[in-house]
C-alpha cells in the first residue's frame, strides 16, 4: 500500500517554496513606485549610454565556440564521478569512458577538418 503521509514533508516544502516567490513578486508589485519616463525604456549597458543600435547580431562563429565549450564542459562533469571511483569500477568501465571521450574528440576533428572552427 502506498502511504501518502510519508511524503507530507515533501509536499509542505513544495508548497512553501512555491508560495514564497509568488508572495515576493506580489509584494514588490504592490509596493514598487510606478514611474514612466525615458530612462525606463532605454537600454542599460553598464551605466553607459548605448552607442548605436541596441540589437547587434553576433556572428555564428561565437556560437560554434560556445557549443564546443559546452560539449567538453558537460563531458568533464560526467567524467568527474567516474574518475573518483576509478579504482573500484574496473577495465570495462575504463573502455566505456574512453569511447565517451573519443566521440567528442572525433567530432571536433571532423569539424576542424571541415572548417567549422575557422575564424575567417
UniProtKB/Swiss-Prot annotation:
Protein EC: 7.1.1.-
Highest taxon listed in the record's lineage: Eukaryota
GO MF assignments: NADH dehydrogenase (ubiquinone) activity; quinone binding
Primary location class: plastid
GO biological process: photosynthesis, light reaction
Keyword Plastid in annotation: yes
Membrane-spanning ranges: 9-29, 64-84, 88-108
Disulfide-linked positions: none
Keyword Coiled coil: no
Gene3D superfamilies: NADH:ubiquinone/plastoquinone oxidoreductase, chain 3
InterPro entries listed in its UniProt record: NAD(P)H_OxRDtase_bac/plastid, NADH_UbQ/plastoQ_OxRdtase_su3, NDAH_ubi_oxred_su3_sf
Subunit (UniProt): NDH is composed of at least 16 different subunits, 5 of which are encoded in the nucleus.
Protein name (database record): NAD(P)H-quinone oxidoreductase subunit 3, chloroplastic
Amino acid at each position: 500500500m502506498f502511504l501518502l503521509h510519508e511524503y507530507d514533508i515533501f509536499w509542505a516544502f513544495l508548497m512553501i517554496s512555491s508560495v514564497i516567490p509568488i508572495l515576493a513578486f506580489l509584494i514588490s508589485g504592490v509596493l514598487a513606485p510606478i514611474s514612466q519616463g525615458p530612462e525606463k525604456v532605454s537600454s542599460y549597458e553598464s551605466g553607459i549610454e548605448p552607442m548605436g543600435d541596441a540589437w547587434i547580431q553576433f556572428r555564428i562563429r561565437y556560437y560554434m565556440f560556445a557549443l564546443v565549450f559546452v560539449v567538453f564542459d558537460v563531458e568533464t562533469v560526467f567524467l568527474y564521478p567516474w574518475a573518483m571511483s576509478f579504482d573500484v569500477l574496473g577495465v570495462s568501465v575504463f573502455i566505456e569512458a574512453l569511447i565517451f571521450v573519443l566521440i567528442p574528440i572525433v567530432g571536433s576533428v571532423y569539424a576542424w577538418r571541415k572548417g567549422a572552427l575557422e575564424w575567417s
